[in-house]
């Protein structure tokens, strides 16, 4: 996923959430609806989250240095994980607290039509934001389902914005039901129940975000299809006999580390092995452009059935 496509979705969501937060909080001030307060805080939290995603994207573009020789690509994962914490604490826990408080001490809505009007406007704005996120995601989603895309995406911005927008629209529907039932029945308990449901929804979304971004922070390797592509690129030539073992790791959304131990003929000159490794690296980069850091170690392979060591300890030296 390009950074520009993620930024488009983030900026669209940020603009929508700032406007929505203001209208929701105004509606809460005039009506006293706890659902409006919960949704207002939710939108403020989302706005802060989008600013964090933009900040993470900017920091990730810093050049590598001696302290971080592989660069700062994982900054995007760090800020995405912080987003899940904010959504859980500020959005979810606050909504649950406010809902329980309103449940224990319910108050009638003072201007019941205002929350309904605000919710309808908010639904329109959130739909625009979600539409933008879906449009940008479709550029990179390929044939994956939405669940697969969210689980497998290495760039966190679009999955985060998608989940936030879906949660926002779902929260608006819950708030609409809570306020609507309060107006119809005259019982403010429904407003409190709607607020609690919003809190539960936000906590669940935050947990999903936290689990997925934690996996990226710990370190994920290439997908099986990408791993197979790299292996084919390595073996698609006469240079090496086989791959003894290979490991991959995403250093950032667009930067993949490839480390492999390759079997070479023990009789080869060192200069020939070095030239072969250069050729293999070029093939890997052509097949997998995200493979920015490639480390290939030459070795001599022994068949395990021959009861010898898996790899030879002979150092391959050049011969004149």
How would you label these PLM feature ranges?
Residues 1, 67-69, 133:
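C-terminal ends of transmembrane helices
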Residues 18-26, 31, 43, 47-53, ...:
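Hydrophobic alpha-helical membrane-embedded segments
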Residues 56-75, 105:
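Aspartate-rich (DDxxD/NDxxD/DxxxD) Mg2+/diphosphate-binding motifs
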Residues 1-22:
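Topogenic membrane-insertion module of multi-pass membrane proteins
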Residues 6, 75-320:
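Alpha-helical transmembrane segments and adjacent TM-loop junctions that form the membrane-embedded core
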Residues 16, 29-59, 96, 100, ...:
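Acidic (Asp/Glu-rich) catalytic motifs at the cytosolic membrane interface
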